[in-house]
Curated annotation (Swiss-Prot):
Keywords: Cytoplasm, Disulfide bond, Electron transport, Redox-active center, Transport. Gene3D superfamilies: Glutaredoxin. Pfam families: Glutaredoxin. PANTHER family: GLUTAREDOXIN 2 (PTHR45694), GLUTAREDOXIN-C2 (PTHR45694:SF14). NCBIfam families: GRX_euk. It comes from Solanum lycopersicum. Has a glutathione-disulfide oxidoreductase activity in the presence of NADPH and glutathione reductase. Reduces low molecular weight disulfides and proteins. Belongs to the glutaredoxin family. CPYC subfamily. This is Glutaredoxin.
Length: 108
């Protein structure tokens, strides 16, 4: 059930961040996404009744047990390091735009 819930969240949102409210790496990723103007769904596993089950299901699905666990355009990205590395390389914004998390603008 928890895996189905996780997959439903991932498929229903351009960006999904499985997070914990007290995790500084999670806060960093959510802050970065917000600064970039991305629309994302944050699932705070420590606030969810079945959060530990969802986290275990994510580990089974992605091989990553740690948070944040980031998905963009239904693709598993990884955690904070992977997300910030994509940003440093100039690859995060195009991924977010392609996924529909950022509105395309005509301004340069």
């Amino acid at each position: 059930m928890s895996l189905a819930k996780a997959k439903e969240i991932v498929s229903g949102n351009p960006v999904a961040v499985f997070s914990k409210t007290y995790c500084p790496f999670c806060v960093s990723v959510k802050d970065l996404l917000s600064k970039l103007g991305a629309t994302f769904k944050a699932v705070e596993l420590d606030s969810e009744k079945d959060g530990s089950e969802i986290q275990a299901a994510l580990a089974e699905w992605t091989g990553q047990r740690t948070v944040p666990n980031v998905f963009i355009g239904r693709k598993h990205i990884g955690g904070c390091d992977a997300t910030t590395a994509l940003h440093r390389e100039g690859k995060l914004l195009p991924l977010l735009t392609e996924a529909g998390a950022i509105a395309k603008t005509s301004t340069a």
